[in-house]
């Protein structure tokens, strides 16, 4: 418990100070370090330490506080929290358990989702001339779904959730505060674009994928926009998520320690082809095995050549041609 409380208190400092160090040593910008102040909330101290002038409005601190609360916990089924349970069950220490959870959260399918949303909207704003033109926005979203635009994955980021269909209650709350902050910042035009994409995106995803259940926006849809309005750099999007989720991870870790006595060992079911045992002396090379072995040998040779600086680019087309002729 003591270690968990210490991490809740110290991770904001580690994240913000690390970012300032990154700015200074990588971007040659001014390094400034500001100590947290007693009596301020965690959200207030983050804004205080992050900004050069240390100033923030009451609404800014309130919105960040709400965002942290909404991200603090979301059940034991999400990837990073389940990681907390699994690693804790091995009997390891608090720091190792939380480090593993942070490693999970770092993945773009988990904690990095809001950054994907923000990058997608930057792409939309750069390629859609009239943000209020519903038809133009819809056409560009269709291009995204058809893998013709943005990152060519066919995904509208921030839309859909593994559990929620009608609505993500966290998104509903965060959207309300995002509107208030957008009004204060004079960014209602951007907020209107987010609303339009939210309204069109769900139905377009359902249509394109032929889904029968509703597709709603999730909490990542507005969180990146909120962080941007607060002046939080993209490099801190996922660390802010980790700062928020530390209390939830800590609670789950304590729960695992108190209620479980065995290590978690998931069961696996083999879904491949079941082949009978063949004695070694009766085995014959399967069709295609020689080709696979040649590819593996060539890959090893290419890797070795790469380490010594040898250029192997010219060999690739010849190898491909050779394989093509063999198949014919």
Model feature map: region roles:
Residues 1-318, 322, 326-328:
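Non-transmembrane, aqueous-exposed alpha-helical and coiled segments at domain scale
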């Amino acid at each position: 418990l003591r270690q968990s409380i210490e991490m809740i208190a110290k991770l904001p400092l580690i994240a913000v100070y690390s970012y300032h160090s990154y700015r200074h040593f990588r971007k040659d910008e001014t390094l400034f370090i500001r100590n947290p102040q007693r009596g301020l909330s965690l959200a207030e101290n983050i804004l205080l330490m992050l900004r050069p002038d240390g100033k923030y409005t009451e609404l800014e601190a309130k919105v960040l506080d709400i965002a942290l609360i909404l991200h603090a916990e979301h059940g034991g089924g999400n990837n990073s929290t389940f990681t907390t349970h699994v690693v804790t069950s091995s009997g390891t220490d608090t720091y190792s358990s939380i480090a593993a959870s942070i490693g999970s959260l770092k993945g773009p399918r988990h904690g990095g989702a809001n950054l994907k949303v923000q990058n997608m909207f930057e792409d939309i704003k750069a390629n859609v001339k009239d943000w209020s033109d519903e038809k133009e926005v819809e056409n560009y979203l269709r291009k995204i779904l058809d893998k013709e635009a943005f990152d060519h994955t066919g995904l509208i980021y921030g839309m859909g959730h593994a559990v929620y269909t009608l609505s993500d209650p966290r998104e509903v709350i965060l959207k309300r505060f995002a509107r208030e902050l957008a009004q204060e910042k004079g960014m209602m035009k951007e907020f209107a674009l987010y609303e339009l994409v939210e309204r069109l995106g769900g139905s377009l995803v359902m249509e394109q994928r032929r889904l029968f259940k509703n597709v709603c926006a999730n909490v990542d849809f507005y969180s990146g926009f909120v962080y941007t309005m607060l002046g939080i750099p993209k490099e801190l999007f996922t660390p802010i998520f980790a700062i928020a989720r530390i209390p939830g991870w800590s609670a789950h870790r304590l729960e695992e320690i108190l209620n479980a006595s065995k290590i978690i060992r998931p069961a696996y079911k083999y879904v491949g082809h079941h082949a009978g045992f063949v004695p070694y002396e009766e085995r014959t090379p399967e069709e295609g095995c020689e080709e696979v072995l040649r590819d593996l040998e060539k890959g090893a040779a290419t890797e070795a050549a790469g380490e010594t600086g040898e250029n192997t680019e010219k060999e690739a087309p010849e190898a491909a041609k050779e394989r093509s002729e063999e198949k014919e």
